[in-house]
Structure formats: C-alpha cells, structure tokens
Amino acid sequence: MAARRGGIRRTDLLRRSGQPRGRHRASAAESGLTWISPTLILVGFSHRGDRRMTEHLSRLTLTLEVDAPLERARVATLGPHLHGVLMESIPADYVQTLHTVPVNPYSQYALARSTTSLEWKISTLTNEARQQIVGPINDAAFAGFRLRASGIATQVTSRSLEQNPLSQFARIFYARPETRKFRVEFLTPTAFKQSGEYVFWPDPRLVFQSLAQKYGAIVDGEEPDPGLIAEFGQSVRLSAFRVASAPFAVGAARVPGFTGSATFTVRGVDTFASYIAALLWFGEFSGCGIKASMGMGAIRVQPLAPREKCVPKP
C-alpha cells in the first residue's frame, strides 16, 4: 500500500499572504510567508503520541582494536563489511523483518581513531531496533570478530550506549530557534538518488528531504508533504561548503558520494527554522541520504552562533 502524504505539511509551518511577524520579518516577507502558532499536528505526536513518546533513539559506540594497520581513509569504507557482521549477530527473524521495511530503523558507520583502532557507531531509531540490534552487540559475549574480506581481526576494548527520547524532536521543534545556521560534517561518503541518478552534492532540498522522509517513515509511515519538500529548496541556503568526491564500494558496485562539510542557513519563520534544527538532530542518528545502514551518510551537526549585531555608539 502506498504511503499517505501526511506528517508535517508546509501549511502547518507557514502560510501565504498576510504580514509576517517576529524578528525575521524581512526574510519572511520576501517569500510572502507568515507565522502560524505552533499548535500544528506534529507527525507522530498527535493521536499516536502516547506510544511514540516512549520511543528512544539510541547510539552504541564500540572501540575496536585491529591486529593489522588500517589506512584512515579505508576505515570509512568498512561499512558494508560491518553491516555483514551486524546481520550475522542479530536474530534471524528480525533480519527478515528488516527486508520488508521501506526505511531501515538503524544506521551504522566506522571512523578511524588511529591506524590500529577504530570506532564503530550503531544507531537505532526505535525501541524494538535497539533491543534486536544493539542488544546482541552490546552484550559482553560480543568481544570481537574477523572481517572476512581482509582477514583483519578486531577486539572490543570499550563500549558505551547513549539513549535519547524521540520526544526531544518535539522539544526542539516547539522551542524558539537558537540559530539559523548549521555546519554539517558528512563523515562518510554521502549520496542521494534523484530520477534514477546519483547526486553527490549537499543540495539543501535533497539533504532535508532525505531527513524528513526517514523521520516520517520511522514515526508513522507517512511521506513528507510535497510543498514542504519544495520549501526546503527555497528557504534553506547552502552558504558555504568544502566537499570532495568519495566513491563508496558496495560489493562490486561503486556508489559515487562526497565527504566534507556544508553550512546551511535557514530563512523564513521561526517554526520552519526549528523544524530544520529538529531534523538535523534526528539525522545524527538516522544518517542522511542512501545506504545509511551500509555505512554511508553519517553526519555530525554543529549549530553556529548567530553574529552579534553591532550597535552604533551614541
């Protein structure tokens, strides 16, 4: 059955005509938008709210020591091999369940700490995924493994588990935005699919469309409103970037991707800016773009402090 178009709609965040309010009057006026009081129905926090308020986003970090030196650049490409380890470690019936879902409720990736040490981060987006995926890996019996492709053996030397309530999304959304500028680091190769083609560039519409789609699919199976997707392209500006192409091997295929950093500046009303901040918070767990479960699309977000306005001396 096709997913319903629902969730947060563009008209929930802003509407046409009228005079904008608040400290961003000029930017809102440029697009003819005005403030709407944030009493909207937030996807997953309306009639489904009681259940969703108990969900958590979790991140398990394993420090792994390896028995042979690894090039730092190579570590970020280990995702598919680590994904294989993950699938062999979790219950077989849950692996079958994962084959039936449109968006995987987890992401994972690895980053180098040194030539003989790496961090493997596994994030889950639901309580069930935490129990089925993180549970077995966080068990003391999971002490290490051997990567089949390279023969390199690993040993778990430390592990830590972070849990955040999904309701934090709503808290960020309803709060007044602290900033409208965000620096996003793309830690592992990132790419998007558009009209059957790979796009390996931090296009604002594709970045935030991806995050909104992942959020909607996980929370209640709904696609983001088309008008809202269009708003991502109109009201989020790529104000700085430093990226490089970085292909990602998945089996015999090579997926074109990019790594680096991009700075996004949000225009429009406060509600929209808060929504962008909430999506970025979620994205640090879900990953951004395609194949986040295979190790692509890992992001780290840094809110940038707004510039202080110079007040002329009397």
Curated annotation (Swiss-Prot):
Ca(2+) and Mn(2+) stimulate processing of pre-crRNA. Residues 1-29 are annotated as: Disordered. Its cofactor is a divalent metal cation. Keywords: Antiviral defense, Endonuclease, Hydrolase, Nuclease, RNA-binding. GO terms for molecular function: endonuclease activity; RNA binding. It holds the Pfam family CRISPR_Cas6. Pre-crRNA processing is inhibited by EDTA. One of its GO terms (biological process) is defense response to virus. Disruption phenotype: Deletion of this gene alone blocks maturation of pre-crRNA. Deletion of the entire CRISPR-Cas locus (cas6 to cas2, Rv2824c to Rv2816c) decreases resistance to plasmids encoding spacer elements about 6-fold. It is an enzyme of class 3 (hydrolase). Its EC number is 3.1.-.-. Encoded in a type III-A CRISPR locus. Belongs to the CRISPR-associated protein Cas6/Cse3/CasE family. CRISPR (clustered regularly interspaced short palindromic repeat) is an adaptive immune system that provides protection against mobile genetic elements (viruses, transposable elements and conjugative plasmids). CRISPR clusters contain sequences complementary to antecedent mobile elements (spacers) and target invading nucleic acids. CRISPR clusters are transcribed and processed into CRISPR RNA (crRNA). NCBIfam families: cas_cas6. This is CRISPR-associated endoribonuclease Cas6.
